[in-house]
Amino acid sequence: MKAPGRLVLIILCSVVFSAVYILLCCWAGLPLCLATCLDHHFPTGSRPTVPGPLHFSGYSSVPDGKPLVREPCRSCAVVSSSGQMLGSGLGAEIDSAECVFRMNQAPTVGFEADVGQRSTLRVVSHTSVPLLLRNYSHYFQKARDTLYMVWGQGRHMDRVLGGRTYRTLLQLTRMYPGLQVYTFTERMMAYCDQIFQDETGKNRRQSGSFLSTGWFTMILALELCEEIVVYGMVSDSYCREKSHPSVPYHYFEKGRLDECQMYLAHEQAPRSAHRFITEKAVFSRWAKKRPIVFAHPSWRTE
């Protein structure tokens, strides 16, 4: 075969292989391929409405390891744990959403007027599981309709070797039959790291960064929700404004850490820190492509 003909054949084979690879990735729903399939990371516009439950392979149930299967949510309220929620009076509005996302041990009792009382999904860091156990009767006995989504890496979450946190989750499902507990799969955790690197240009580990529970919550919400309202999350420029009020880092820990002081300290720390402000800049960019609204404080994406 002549050189020009061989070159054309090589190009055609490459195109066909690439097309087949992308189609297989999308069909299989592999998290590590999603960046190729879904307009870099997340599709533009609202999430397509698909009748019936969907399978989400990035989340694995405890103890059987089955993927998350559930109906998509038409409207979602993502409730920040920030002190911005104090005095908001948005509880009824939050509870009116079809699905309500909460994070870690953020309580509702005593704060219903501001943060609502419903909890559809609670995204929990593996380090926060012991904090929920301090009030296990409330979180796991009374709130039986809540789905718990736990994220974490390393030996504590190891299913095969029985990591400490995983053993705790396993025990909870035995104590409370019917309790819905899921974990982010290893592939999904790697995918979340890759999104951070693609969005910021920085490798998470090499830059000394820990992703926040808010990061994992937003990614989960983007998969499950058609429309998202985020309550109590400030913009990436908020803490640089001279007129911003001082509020507690968590609405349920009054008189403790200041929100902006915490954000700035983590952003400037060289190692082992959350990059809260960087993450908020990323969320702002996502809101340009997806129906995400930020409320209390209300701010527009730039």
From Swiss-Prot:
Glycosylated residues (UniProt): N135
Protein location: Golgi apparatus membrane
Tissue expression as described in the entry: Ubiquitous.
InterPro entries per record: Glyco_trans_29 (IPR001675), GT29-like_sf (IPR038578)
EC number: 2.4.3.7
Presence of keyword Magnesium: no
Function: Transfers the sialyl group (N-acetyl-alpha-neuraminyl or NeuAc) from CMP-NeuAc to the GalNAc residue on the NeuAc-alpha-2,3-Gal-beta-1,3-GalNAc sequence of glycoproteins and glycolipids forming an alpha-2,6-linkage. Produces branched type disialyl structures by transfer of a sialyl group onto a GalNAc residue inside the backbone core chains. Prefers O-glycans to glycoproteins or glycolipids.
Family, as annotated: Belongs to the glycosyltransferase 29 family.
Protein name as catalogued: Alpha-N-acetyl-neuraminyl-2,3-beta-galactosyl-1,3-N-acetyl-galactosaminide alpha-2,6-sialyltransferase
